[in-house]
C-alpha cells in the first residue's frame, strides 16, 4: 500500500497565470523574483527534485539529473485564496470566487453584526492579527468592543481579550457571523481569535476556533477516508476542509514545527495521506513584502526536505506544491494569481519526468487517488502513468 506525503509550501507560486491581468498580478513570480532579488537561492534539494527544470521558470538553477518528476499546475477556479487553492487541489473547482474584502467589510455587514451581537466593533480592515490586537487592544479593553479584521484570504476574524469577552461568548459571536456570511456574502472561514495581556503586550491564546464551510462536493480526502485509510492533517489543513475527510489533525507553531509534525506522522502512520501546510512563507513574509525573510525561510525548509526523504518507505510518494502566489517583491501585499510547482519523488517512481503544464490543481488530487488505487469520480487528469516505473 502506497502512502503519500503532500506538503504545501503556502504561497510559493512560480509565475503569473495567463489571466493574471484580471487580478492585477501581471509580473508576479513569487519564487523566481525572490531568487532574482537574492542573487540566487541556495535550495539544493528543491533543485535536485527538479524545481529549476519546470517549463517557463525564471532565475532558478536547472539540474542535469533530477531525482524527482516536475511540472506546474494552473488554477481553474476563480480566485487566488488559500481555501480555493486547497479545495481545487482536492478536486473542487469553484466557478464563483469566495469573497475577499481588501477594503474591510461593507457597512451593511458590520451594522447587522453589531445589532446581532449587541455591541459596536473596532477595526474592520485588513490587518496582521498579532499587530491589530496591540494596536486596538487597549481600546477594546476600555470599551468591550470586539476587534473585527480580515486578510488576503476569504476570512472574517473576531478578536477579543478572554477576560473582556469570555471565549464561549466570542464563539457565539462567530457563529452569528458564520450564519450571516453565506450566499452572495460567503466567506471561507469565520475565525475566533482570543487573546490575553502578557509581559507588556497582547498575545493570542490557543483557543482559536474556525467556523469554516464544508467543501461543496466530494474531495480527495473524503475518498481516502472512506476506504479506511488515514488522512493526517498538519497545520491549517483541518480548518480549510472544515475537518471533513480527516482522521487526525495537529496544528503547528511555524514551518519547522510543521516539518517536525509531518515527520512524527510518518513514523506513526503507514498508509494513506499525510497532508501538511507550511504557512510562514505566506503569513510572515509574503504579505509583509519581506523578500529577505521569505528567501531565508525557503533555504531553511529546503534543508529539512532530506529528513523527510530519508524517512520515506519504499512505496512512499512525496509531493511538494503550493496553493497560490504571494510575491513579496511587488507593491501588492495580496496573494498573486500564479502557477504552482509540482515536485514528485518516490523510490519506486521514475526520475526526471517532465509532467508538463497541467490545466488544474485538481490533477494533484486525482494522481494521489490513482497512487492509492482508489476508484473515484474526482475532477482532474492524473499523471500516475507518466511517473510509474
Swiss-Prot record:
Reactions the enzyme catalyzes: 2-deoxy-alpha-D-ribose 1-phosphate = 2-deoxy-D-ribose 5-phosphate; alpha-D-ribose 1-phosphate = D-ribose 5-phosphate
Co-factor binding details: Binds 2 manganese ions.
Keywords of this entry: Cytoplasm, Isomerase, Manganese, Metal-binding
Enzyme class: isomerase
InterPro entries (alphabetical): Alkaline_phosphatase_core_sf, DeoB, Metalloenzyme, Phosphopentomutase_DeoB_cap_sf
Entry's localization field: Cytoplasm
Cofactors: Mn(2+)
Molecular function GO labels: magnesium ion binding; manganese ion binding; phosphopentomutase activity
Database matches in HAMAP family: Phosphopentomut
PANTHER family according to UniProt: PHOSPHOPENTOMUTASE
Role according to the record: Isomerase that catalyzes the conversion of deoxy-ribose 1-phosphate (dRib-1-P) and ribose 1-phosphate (Rib-1-P) to deoxy-ribose 5-phosphate (dRib-5-P) and ribose 5-phosphate (Rib-5-P), respectively.
Protein name: Phosphopentomutase
